[in-house]
Design a protein with these regions (language model features):
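Class I SAM-dependent methyltransferase core
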Residues: 304, 334-336
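Residue-level recognition of the N-termini of beta-strands and the immediately preceding loop/turn
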Residues: 29, 56-57, 145-146, 328-332, ...
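Conserved acid/base catalytic micro-environments in cytosolic active-site loops
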Residues: 1-293, 307
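Conserved SAM-binding loop of SAM-dependent methyltransferases across substrates and taxa
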Residues: 339-357
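Phosphate-binding P-loop
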Residues: 22-26, 322-329
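Extended basic-aromatic, gly/pro-enriched interface segments that bind polyanionic ligands
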Residues: 335, 356-431
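Class I SAM-dependent methyltransferase Rossmann-like catalytic core
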Residues: 251, 269, 276, 281, ...
Length: 431
């Protein structure tokens, strides 16, 4: 099994050819496209509708047999005037170029605008090249990252889109009609991190607009910038709308982060001025909900911090049990639980620690979040197949039930977890 890494962090050492781009000059949007079965036909449709001067780079990651003949660049070059290049290690990406992952590659990553390849070991671990690349794309390009999931039969890609959306990028999935193989896009959609569900032609049209939108010229997260006086006033109006509609005050949040989320929403609605977006918010209450969800940035996964889980089992749980009698109550509160993955991870870890002793204990795990949509999903306890990357086969078999749409947490774990809407900054704690 591949060792679980911390979310969105890739241990890649820069080569001598790597040069970190300056604040804005060398940054341009990069579109990561993931697919498997039936993808070439749909990608061709996207190419035919795609302008040649978007100033974007396109990087294609697909599931192919390592023995597959390397003809993809030649086949794709017939459909576009953009240069189509097979990705190679240490290659600097350029605007208006298409890069294709070679079939023998296990993983393709992007660091400081440079491609890195790791050869695919035969028959080892789950093969998730789309997730791996999209996570690196999110880390490298942040709000300049765009993720597209096309036709395919697998569960790869959902976690990669989550990473892109969390860093302020924009995400697409191909609509089921006329998608020949819909497993990959449907799994991504079910995970809840897709901004647009469109046909290949519609995706190309939307990309053409987004390419020149000011949102993508916003500096990266590690570049400091301050909101202007006008932006400060406009932010106050938006905060007031959200406070009246939802009851949450975002005044104390980092302005740069908030501005990125707002400008992301503006790009999606093709609005160039903040004043126009404020008017749009005033006349579209549903958009206030969408902006609220965007601001919360629900980044989570099962067992996302393996070291923390091990510390609970080795240090914290033994202390709790030591303080209890043979028959006692264990109560745990997990605030900001998002869609429930971390709360269920703690519950599973506790069950593993207790073993047969679990039957003698009364366990109550309270999990809370301000996001009603996230709490609703946590209560359903159904997750896409992409969790196979984070949950080992033994845990999947013992604590999950296989469903057509993915996996559901088993009844025993669900019975000890209570989810509630709660603002940890304003509401009193659980007694």
């Amino acid at each position: 099994m591949k060792k679980q890494a911390k979310p969105f962090r890739l241990d890649i050492k820069p080569t001598k050819s790597d040069t970190k781009p300056s604040a804005e000059t060398d940054i341009f949007p990069v579109v990561g496209i993931g697919a498997s079965a039936g993808w070439l036909n749909t990608f061709t449709q996207l190419l035919h509708a795609q302008p040649m001067n978007t100033d974007m780079a396109f990087i294609v990651v697909q599931h192919l047999d390592p023995k597959h003949i390397r003809l993809l660049p030649e086949l794709m070059a017939r459909e576009t005037v953009m240069p189509v290049i097979e990705a190679r290690d240490g290659l600097n990406i350029k605007r208006n170029h298409i890069y294709v992952m070679p079939p023998s590659t296990h993983s393709l990553t992007l660091l400081h605008g440079v491609l890195h390849l790791i050869q695919r070991p035969e028959g080892r671990g789950k093969y998730l090249p789309i997730d791996h690349f999209l996570k690196s794309l999110a880390q490298d390009r942040q709000n300049n990252a765009i993720g597209v999931i096309l036709s395919g039969t697998a569960s790869d890609g959902a976690l990669g889109l989550q990473a892109i959306k969390a860093t302020g990028g924009i995400t697409f999935a191909q609509s089921e009609n006329p998608c020949e193989f819909s497993d990959i896009p449907n799994n991504a959609i079910a995970a809840g991190d897709v901004d647009f569900i469109l046909t290949p032609k519609e995706i190309a049209e939307k990309l053409a607009f987004i390419a020149h939108y000011p949102h993508l010229k916003f500096p990266l997260f590690n570049v400091e910038s301050k909101a202007t006086t006008q932006e400060d006033e406009e932010l106050k109006k938006i905060f007031q709308l959200l406070r009246e509609h939802i009851g949450i005050d975002f005044t104390g949040y980092k302005k740069n982060t908030i501005l990125r989320r707002i400008k992301r929403r503006m790009a999606m609605h093709q609005l160039n001025r903040m004043t126009d977006y404020i008017k749009f918010l005033q006349t579209h209450p549903k958009e206030q909900d969408m902006l609220f969800h965007d601001m919360l940035i629900n980044v989570t996964s099962f067992f996302r911090e393996p070291e923390t889980i091990e510390a609970l089992k080795k240090e914290i749980f033994p202390q709790i049990i030591q303080q209890k009698s043979n028959v006692g109550t264990i109560r745990i509160w997990i605030p900001a639980c998002s869609t429930g993955e971390e709360a269920y991870s703690v519950a599973i870890a506790l069950f593993e620690f207790l073993g047969t002793q679990v039957n003698t204990m009364h366990i109550q795990i309270f999990a809370s979040d301000v996001n009603k949509q996230a709490i609703d999903k946590a209560r359903q306890a159904i997750y896409s197949q992409s969790i196979e990357e984070a949950v080992n086969p033994g845990r999947l078999q013992q604590f999950f039930v296989k469903k057509k749409s993915g996996y559901q947490i088993c009844q025993a774990i669900r019975d000890v977890c209570d989810f509630a809407i709660h603002n940890a900054l304003q509401d009193p704690p659980f007694p």
